[in-house]
Amino acid sequence: MQTNLLKPKAINVEQLGPNRAKVALEPFERGYGHTLGNAIRRVLLSSMVGYAATEVTIAGVLHEYSSIDGVQEDVVNILLNLKGVVFKLHNRDEVTLSLRKDGEGVVTARDIQTPHDVEIVNPEHVIATLSAGGKLDMQIKVEKGRGYVPGNLRRYADEATKSIGRIVLDASFSPVKRVSYTVESARVEQRTDLDKLVVEIETNGAITAEDAVRASAKILVEQLAVFAQLEGGELAAFDAPASSRGAATFDPILLRPVDELELTVRSANCLKAENIYYIGDLIQRTENELLKTPNLGRKSLNEIKEVLASRGLTLGMKLENWPPAGLDKR
């Protein structure tokens, strides 16, 4: 009787666009398609390293709820646009960049002054629009990180580094925008009960889709390696810093605002009316609870369920110690 598990022998990569690809692997033993597909998908969404703007200082601006003479967008919209700029740092973990422009015209990511080892992947991305006599002068701090980090959860070891006018941003470091996987039937000789795993991935251009899949697989291998090294007895205890003991660790996707789910305006407004601001708030609600929300019907509920399912989440989940300390409940 055959006791060895099958391993994929065929790998096919299909380019679907500049930053999109479909990776297919086969054959897998029955059930392994979902086991590995879900693991890779969760790692791709939550654990990839990337770069993002984390702090901004704008000349003449004290806080984000300001406006700038001669600039059509208010500061909030400028910051939102800035979050859409895709950075790529080579051989460094952080950098402070300058953007200075005056006179009528559109300000794009191309106007950001960068050293030779900093790359802007989408230089045509619009940041602001200047009217005649308008001027925009800002300093942008870009850092390397992982996942999603809300600005209000960031901590500074040196309180003296805080200064008036410095705006801390929510940072989405992940270069992966969307991931989905499907499991199809595969056949090897007379066996027809096998799996074919198809992973479709879209990135922001800072990393290719193929490299993202490789990186996620490497993370999984490193995490699982410890199980292959068990020799009995106890593993060395992890001595966590006193400041972090007892603190719950949540999947970064749960700390993201529900706005990032890109729901219809009707659904988004209904959730905010119920004080549901974060994805972690949403998944703890049941279907019956949401249906009791004014103006939220079955169609909106189905939309919410589909969007959550695309991220490997469902309604009615339980989270211990939610919300985390310091999470802004707005």
Swiss-Prot record:
Source domain of life:
Bacteria
Q: Which SUPFAM superfamilies match?
A: C-terminal domain of RNA polymerase alpha subunit, Insert subdomain of RNA polymerase alpha subunit, RBP11-like subunits of RNA polymerase
Please, one GO biological process term?
DNA-templated transcription
Q: Report keywords, A-Z.
A: DNA-directed RNA polymerase, Nucleotidyltransferase, Transcription, Transferase
For this protein, the Enzyme Commission number is: 2.7.7.6
Organism, per UniProt? Answer: Acidovorax ebreus (strain TPSY) (Diaphorobacter sp. (strain TPSY))
Q: How does it assemble?
A: Homodimer. The RNAP catalytic core consists of 2 alpha, 1 beta, 1 beta' and 1 omega subunit. When a sigma factor is associated with the core the holoenzyme is formed, which can initiate transcription.
Task: Provide the reaction this enzyme catalyses.
Answer: RNA(n) + a ribonucleoside 5'-triphosphate = RNA(n+1) + diphosphate
Role, per record: DNA-dependent RNA polymerase catalyzes the transcription of DNA into RNA using the four ribonucleoside triphosphates as substrates.
Region of interest called Alpha N-terminal domain (alpha-NTD), as start-end residue ranges on this chain: 1-231
Q: What class of enzyme is it?
A: transferase
**What GO molecular functions are on record for this protein?**
DNA binding; DNA-directed RNA polymerase activity; protein dimerization activity
**Matching SMART domains:** RPOLD
Region Alpha C-terminal domain (alpha-CTD): start-end pairs: 250-330
Q: Which InterPro entries does the UniProt record give?
A: DNA-dir_RNA_pol_insert, DNA-dir_RNA_pol_RpoA/D/Rpb3, DNA-dir_RpoA, RBP11-like, RNAP_asu_C, RNApol_insert_sf
Q: Does the keyword NAD apply?
A: no
Pfam family membership, one: RNA_pol_L
> What's the name of the protein?
DNA-directed RNA polymerase subunit alpha
Which cellular component appears as one GO term in the record? cytoplasm
The UniProt family comment states: Belongs to the RNA polymerase alpha chain family.
| Keyword Transcription among UniProt keywords | yes
Domain comment, as recorded: The N-terminal domain is essential for RNAP assembly and basal transcription, whereas the C-terminal domain is involved in interaction with transcriptional regulators and with upstream promoter elements.
